């Protein structure tokens, strides 16, 4: 909202994302407020987009082609000095650069964020060097604990993951971006296939009283003996996806794979495919 205030209370949606990106990329901030990933029109923050919608629902913003402040409140005065200086720096340096000119500026400076753009050929006359991505079949695992949706998706993009396999029993999260519907749509728009395999999850009722590593080990031993034994067909389907050349990532909540049942799944799959899992 302070960014909108700096730009006279109104910005086109694409410009808003680009200016916010530049504030994070080129100026010193008190912390990383938003992460960005390469999307349809360059750097994009799902979290920032969600925040805009939330503020619109509260009546503080209006959203159309442009994002507009509804009230002339001094949001800048609420910021730390370093953050206020960053936003004012973006305005001073880029206020005359808008629309396609702003997109071209960002694409030229930060080609990583242009790799998924639908309009890259229209914006840039010259070719830019895009990051080279691994294409060989691989197996990964990733937890979203401690990650924003943008950081999480950026990790998948960086590893060129083609299939994301959700092994949660109940794919619902209070954390924005990680409930099934939102995660499905986000990955789909990035060209990543999302598959939910609830049969590989653990019932919530069995996750009580897990206080020590030994508690988790006992739970996962039981999981192997009961669940993995009766889901051999599902595990074979994962192996088949790998054999087709996909770069697979198994996902759940816990960041540390030792405290997540996906480590037992990957252990089983490793024996079948002769490949070591990279835990992201």
Feature locations, PLM:
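Short, basic/glycine-rich phosphate-binding loops at helix/coil junctions
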Residues: 130-134, 210-221
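Short Gly/Thr/Asp-enriched flexible loops that form oxyanion-binding sites at enzyme active sites
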Residues: 179, 259-270
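Short, surface-exposed acidic-centric catalytic microdomains
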Residues: 174-216
